[in-house]
Amino acid sequence: MSKYQINCIRYRHFLRTSNISQIPDFTKYCIGPVNEELAPYIMETMKAYPSNSEYINPQHYYHNRTVLVENYLKRSPNPVSLTQLAQYYDDSTKLTRTKIINSGKFVKEELVIRIAHKLNQLQQLPFNVVNNFHFVQVYESYYNIFESFRKYPTIRTLEDASQFADFIKNMLEGFNTLNLPHLIMGALECTILDLYPREKMDQLLSDLLRARISRRLIVEEHVSITANYTSGKEENTLVLGDIFQECSAKKYLLEASEESQKFIQDMYFKDIPMPEFIIEGDTQLSFYFLPTHLKYLLGEILRNTYEATMKHYIRKGLEKPEPIIVTVVSNDESYLFRISDKAGGVLHDDENLWSFGKSKERAQESLNNFHKLPGLQTVSIYDEVHSHTKYNSKLKSLQSITLKPYMHTSLEPMSYPSIINGHIKYETPLIELLKRSFRYKLGIGLAMCKVYAEYWNGDLSLHSMPGYGTDVVLKLGNLMKHTKKLQLDKV
């Protein structure tokens, strides 16, 4: 073949693959000419490994291959029931030394396997998705969990199990608390940039969130039974363990209504007329549930309902706001809350309501508000944490640099309660999202609620009549009917 023919082939290949292995033209991304002072930073942002990363480095591929892929990915997670988590196979609510030790062994091994499979799920994503700043934070955090639990010494004694429970609390109260907002911000950014189909992104977040609930449930159950046993308690509450409580539907509805009214007063003014809040149906209903999740679900839904009702009241110039009516219904299998308003119906498309990505315009609006939330700046919390050698010094540095200016104010960062409180709070990030100011419209409330409702064998649906109003129907499964059902990322 002549040199001319070879050059022709090369030229045709260049025309077909002009964007492969070529130096990027950064000028097309700039408003004006390239500033030479910025040139050194291009290498920093384009290099293969993040700065100060404890896990993503030149050795990561080989370590990941030999440890995660060739070892832990060959093991399957164990589906468990609520009964097993509380009883550990001896079919009683009695707390014993053996039960606590077996619980610790199971949690240590199971969490490593489960987080390994989620790491692999992230690794299978397109590079420009998993390389997103927020997904990198989640990946770093997951690998931190994987390595920390994998390397933790074998649990053989009650003292080992007790120390393991303390270790778990430190993990949950540390920098892993920001995984939830980082997951959502990463999804929003990928939607805006067209990096991943919206349907696939919604499924990815749903999978990761359900797995997150399961992991925290397993961990919290072990912390609970260990604390109970070491404090002298001899028996768990019922078969579900003490992290589940008997919840009064009316009490939680009234609390959610009160918080929503405070939200409206903050949004407008203190003495603004409030809609009448009416509870109908099975008003005396009490059922066993995870208190924080019930508070979040009812709070998020009522917050939206109150906001829509008040906007309708002002827009129409009504004499007083229309009432909000909650109908409570129950049977042997499930509990149902129907929240009805007369606020004119929902304006957005149905597909946008249940999506984390939404349209590009709404995704950008949500992302902007996420970035305004105190404690969620785009500076990585992991960079600060990893720059210190001891856990306590990490927390003190974080508090003084990031948290102190907002302490005891309405702008207190979302991460603060989880990081420094002396006792563990289950799903603190959820409640902090719920407490956000009206200024921060995130647009992911219903999508989040649907994932959590489905996890608990329920559902969330919305029925809107344009020009009249909306019914939001929250269904939750009866946990006492599903205590022995084996599931992986669902009850």
From Swiss-Prot:
Keyword Membrane: no
Keywords: ATP-binding, Kinase, Mitochondrion, Nucleotide-binding, Transferase, Transit peptide
EC number(s) from the headed UniProt entry: 2.7.11.2
Record: residues binding ATP: 300-307, 341, 359-360, 383-446
CDD domains per the UniProt record, alphabetical: HATPase_PDK-like (cd16929)
Reactions accelerated catalytically: L-seryl-[pyruvate dehydrogenase E1 alpha subunit] + ATP = O-phospho-L-seryl-[pyruvate dehydrogenase E1 alpha subunit] + ADP + H(+)
Principal localisation: mitochondrion
Coiled-coil residue windows: none
Keyword Chaperone: no
Ranges where the Histidine kinase domain occurs: 153-480
Gene Ontology molecular function: ATP binding; protein kinase activity; pyruvate dehydrogenase (acetyl-transferring) kinase activity
Pfam families cross-referenced by the UniProt entry: BCDHK_Adom3
InterPro entries for the chain: AK/P_DHK_N_sf, BCDHK/PDK_N, BCKD/PDK, HATPase_C_sf
GO CC list: mitochondrial matrix; mitochondrion
Gene Ontology BP term (one): regulation of mitophagy
Note: Present with 450 molecules/cell in log phase SD medium.
Subunit-structure text: Interacts with PKP1.
Protein name, entry field: [Pyruvate dehydrogenase (acetyl-transferring)] kinase 2, mitochondrial
This protein's encoding gene: PKP2
